[in-house]
Amino acid sequence: MTRLDSVERAVADIAAGKAVIVIDDEDRENEGDLIFAAEKATPEMVAFMVRYTSGYLCVPLDGAICDRLGLLPMYAVNQDKHGTAYTVTVDARNGVGTGISASDRATTMRLLADPTSIAEDFTRPGHVVPLRAKDGGVLRRPGHTEAAVDLARMAGLQPAGAICEIVSQKDEGSMAQTDELRVFADEHDLAMITIADLIEWRRKHEKHIERIAEARIPTRHGEFRAIGYTSIYEEVEHVALVRGEIAGPNSDGDDVLVRVHSECLTGDVFGSRRCDCGPQLDAAMAMVAREGRGIVLYMRGHEGRGIGLMHKLQAYQLQDAGEDTVDANLKLGLPADARDYGIGAQILVDLGVRSMRLLTNNPAKRVGLDGYGLHIIERVPLPVRTNAENIRYLMTKRDKMGHDLAGLDDFHESVHLPGEFGGAL
């Protein structure tokens, strides 16, 4: 595996006026961009970028800057396959020659990043290509445009960067790939990170949730407080069903019984027997109700282990044709499990949880939450409900995904009546 540097180093280098290399996903452009902060642009930095890249220098900007400077889309209907939001090209109106030299382009870059600049400070068209970044940065769109703006903002600078794709020194008709980029980074003392690293860092270190509403919800397992949250950048709503006092005058947020439940429309609502999701949700609510204190966190956007409802139905088609639940996802070009628990972890922290007993049969869920500073003192298994429709699915989860599911080899049709785990408590 190619060695990468820390996001912290990359941010520090951006703040110091240095360039960094950012690599995107191999299934996307699979390229490395040279990136620096636009307000730190110098003729030497631009000349270095021109020498080792394609020379098509772009300046990613946040939406507010684009609006202030009147930077309209280059074309009304964006047909770029990655949705890169090119705007009209510009040059600085004053202090430049033709606009193409390294010195001229550095001047234009700095002016684009200047919070006092106005639309009339630029001529159109020009030799620098502004790009409009998505609000929310790499959490909304995992592109180099957003990475550049995020890095500049994280460095305490204006949300404006400069980017260009690095060309291979072995084959100048191609772009440099990961191994060659590492060599290049070492030769020039440049930090190298991935967009995935940046996404992970932001999820872990920034707050991305907002508490919206709270209401009393009477259920057949008793009464819960339903606390609603929105995920700011993903436009997804989540609900925490809370029983008892989690943290307050009589509770310290420790030893909380918690279930983090991934949304499953087919299992939770329709009662599908293809999975065990509905019974797990029911059992978790009953166990928390019996405990008298705990949380069932219902995570929206996790449908089909994060691949979405339509893809899940397509995966079901492949399973009916003989694939298992893991291979069906992979055959669709999707990960076996695409869920991220960062938002869930932030919600639990907001609710006052410090340590928990986690209701799950999935050890990976424990790892996913542990990484966000929550202390998991115990993994509490959930009852397994088997039937002829879900036994193969459960065996695949056990054998390929490491779920702790005992007794499947002794399968016989399980019969469970409604309310088995406690009824109305």
Curated annotation (Swiss-Prot):
Q: Which cofactor does it need?
A: Mg(2+); Mn(2+); Zn(2+)
UniProt region (GTP cyclohydrolase II), positions on chain: 205-425
Residues annotated as the enzyme's active site: D337, R339
S-S pairs = none
Q: Which Gene3D superfamilies match?
A: DHBP synthase (3.90.870.10), GTP cyclohydrolase II (3.40.50.10990)
Q: Indicate which residues the UniProt annotation says bind Mg(2+) 2.
A: E29, H144
Ordered alphabetically, the record's keywords are:
GTP-binding, Hydrolase, Lyase, Magnesium, Manganese, Metal-binding, Multifunctional enzyme, Nucleotide-binding, Riboflavin biosynthesis, Zinc
GTP-binding in keyword set: yes
- Residue positions annotated to bind D-ribulose 5-phosphate are R28, E29, D33, R141, P142, G143, H144, T145, E165
Q: What does this protein do?
A: Catalyzes the conversion of D-ribulose 5-phosphate to formate and 3,4-dihydroxy-2-butanone 4-phosphate.
Q: Which family, according to the similarity comment?
A: In the N-terminal section; belongs to the DHBP synthase family. In the C-terminal section; belongs to the GTP cyclohydrolase II family.
Q: What is this protein called?
A: Riboflavin biosynthesis protein RibBA
Q: Which organism is it from?
A: Mycolicibacterium paratuberculosis (strain ATCC BAA-968 / K-10)
Q: Its gene? A: ribBA
